[in-house]
């Protein structure tokens, strides 16, 4: 909510914590509870644009790109999760009370984009859109294969680059002044990527995966969900599990992660239908069956 909304409803942190001083209250908004934008609404797309993410995503000759998912919201959720654990730990280890977590969508996303502010202060650099190449290491790209599929490869470490040069049957490139060091390869990455791309284009996805894996090169497939649902990694690690659903039968869903050795998570039930647990919740807070029935008769619940 925009800052001030809870206060307008009469349930601001001061009111809630007067009832229970141990509460940890996470306030998530686009721009945070303070600052010149605090009063503004802020959806994830705005944050993805203003944070620097879109400016550095995409190709140099095209418009900035927004992510095809709620990236800012999801990263803020992970940050909030960590903040709640820290606040609970502080409460239980001597601080003795709850606190309010002021979480904007902006700061978590801005933080994972790297030390842009520091780099800009030192040398004035501004990250540019460079597609899959990146600005600091080469070769790194997505490569089309002979069957129309794609693989991703990163051979940016010097030892990996030297293995790659041998694997693509161009060992002389290791001593080529254009590609001698990583800065050299970044400077001349257009020529380098052309050479590497031509080699990948001669083989299918599976042929490339097998060929480079045998030679210790880090290559992986570009997968969509149809590929993933039957992928041996997904199956072997149980990334997705099947759960019973009253409407759809057996449904594949993300399994809980991270995987704790002593107390692994589990999905007890599928998501409830709207209002499915209303009576149960109202009973937990002390309402009788007659009172709940009255609320239903009046259309309140």
Task: Label each PLM-derived region with a short phrase.
Residues 5-156:
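Active-site-adjacent "lid/gating" segments in soluble enzymes
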Residues 80-87, 163-167, 195, 227, ...:
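Alpha-helical scaffold segments in soluble metabolic enzymes
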Residues 214-268:
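A glycine-rich dinucleotide-binding beta-alpha-beta segment and adjacent secondary-structure elements
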Residues 134, 139-215, 219:
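Aromatic-enriched alpha-helical interface/lid elements that frame and gate functional surfaces
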Residues 175-185, 223-230, 291-301:
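Short linear loop/turn motifs
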Residues 180, 244, 248-294:
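Flexible, small-/acidic-enriched active-site or ligand-binding loops
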Residues 16, 25, 44, 84, ...:
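Residue-level signal for nonpolar/aromatic packing positions in well-ordered secondary structure
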Residues 98-106, 211, 293-297:
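Beta-strand segments within the central parallel beta-sheet cores of soluble alpha/beta enzyme folds
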């Amino acid at each position: 909510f925009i800052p001030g909304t809870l206060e307008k409803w009469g349930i601001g942190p001061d009111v809630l914590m007067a009832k229970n001083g141990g509460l940890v209250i996470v306030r998530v908004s686009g721009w945070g509870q303070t600052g010149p934008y605090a009063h503004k609404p802020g959806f994830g797309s705005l944050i993805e644009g203003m944070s620097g993410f879109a400016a550095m995503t995409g190709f140099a000759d095209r418009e900035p790109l927004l992510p095809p998912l709620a990236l800012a919201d999801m990263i803020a959720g992970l940050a909030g999760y960590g903040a709640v654990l820290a606040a609970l730990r502080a409460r239980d280890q001597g601080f003795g009370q709850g606190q309010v977590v002021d979480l904007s969508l902006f700061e978590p996303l801005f933080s994972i984009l790297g030390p842009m502010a520091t780099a800009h202060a030192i040398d004035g650099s501004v990250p540019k859109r460079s597609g899959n190449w990146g600005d600091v290491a080469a070769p790194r790209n997505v490569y089309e294969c002979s069957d129309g599929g794609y693989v991703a490869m990163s051979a940016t470490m010097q030892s990996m680059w030297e293995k790659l040069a041998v694997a693509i049957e161009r060992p002389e490139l290791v001593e080529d002044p254009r590609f001698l060091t990583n800065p050299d390869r970044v400077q001349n990455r257009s020529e380098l990527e052309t050479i590497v791309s031509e080699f990948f284009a001669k083989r299918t996805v599976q042929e490339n995966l097998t060929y480079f894996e045998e030679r210790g090169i880090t290559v992986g497939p570009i997968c969509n969900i149809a590929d993933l649902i039957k992928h041996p990694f997904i199956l072997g690690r149980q990334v997705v599990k099947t759960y019973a659903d009253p409407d759809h039968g057996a449904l594949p869903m993300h399994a809980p992660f991270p995987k704790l050795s002593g107390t692994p998570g589990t999905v007890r039930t599928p998501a409830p239908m709207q209002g499915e647990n209303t009576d149960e919740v109202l009973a937990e807070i002390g309402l009788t069956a007659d009172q709940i029935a009255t609320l239903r008769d009046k259309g309140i619940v």
